[in-house]
Amino acid sequence: MKARIRVLCVDDHRLVREGIALIISGTRDMEVVGAATTGEEAIAQFRRHRPDVTLMDLRLAGAVSGVDAIKAIHAEAPDARIIVLTMYSGDEDIHRALVAGATAYLLKDTLSDDLLRVIREVHAGGRPVSPDVKALLDARSGQRNLTRREIEVLELVAKGKRNKEIAVLLGMSLETVPVHLKHIFAKLDVTDRTAAVGVALRRGIVHID
C-alpha cells in the first residue's frame, strides 16, 4: 500500500486547523501528523515529524512569523515542501514567502479540491503557481523595492507616528525622515502618507496588527 502524504498544519486559528484536518481526513492518501499555532511550534513540529508537506500561514501568534519559520525550516531541510495558505494576497507577501523557501502560495478562499490537488502536486515535486499569483508577481517585477530602512519608516507612518517620533524611534535626524518619505512616495507612485500606507497595506509591504 502506498504511504500517505504526511501533512503538518500551521495556523493560529483553531477553526482553520480543524477545517483542514477535516478536509484531509476525507482522503485516502493523506493524513495530518501535526499542528502548530506559532512559528516556534512550527519549527519544532517539523523537526519532530518531518512531514512530506507543510501548510503554513504567514501571520502567526508569537515572535516568529510564517516567513521566518519557512526560512528556518528551509535552512535545516532545503528539500522541505511548504505551501503557504493565508488570507494575505499582496505581491510583497507572496514574494517574501517564495524567497524564504515556500513551494507554493494559496489563499484561504481556495476550494478544498484545489487545496488537495496542490498538496499532491507539491508532494510529487511540482511548484504550482495560480494565474492570480503569477499576475501579481509579473506586475511586481516592474516596481522598485523599498529598502529595509524605508520599510521601517513606512511601518511607523502606518502606526500614525509623526516625523519627530519616527526620527527618535529609528535613531535618525529629523531632517532625514522627509528624505526617506520622498523616496517611498516615488517608489510607490503616490504623493502623500495616507496613499503610501494604503498601497503598502494592499501589497503586503507592511501590516498593522
Task: Set out the residue ranges of the language-model regions.
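Conserved acidic segment of CheY-like receiver
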Residues: 3-16, 20-24
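Conserved active-site segment of CheY-like receiver
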Residues: 12, 63, 85-89, 108-110
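Acidic, metal-coordinating helix/loop segments flanking the phosphotransfer/catalytic sites
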Residues: 35-53
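Acidic catalytic/metal-coordinating carboxylates
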Residues: 38-41, 62-68
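Short amphipathic alpha-helix used as the core "switch/output" element in two-component signaling
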Residues: 44, 67-79
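Active-site residues of response regulator receiver
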Residues: 57-58, 86
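Short, flexible helix-to-coil linker/hinge segments that flank and couple to helix-turn-helix
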Residues: 92-99, 103-154, 205
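Recognition helix of helix-turn-helix DNA-binding domains
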Residues: 162-195
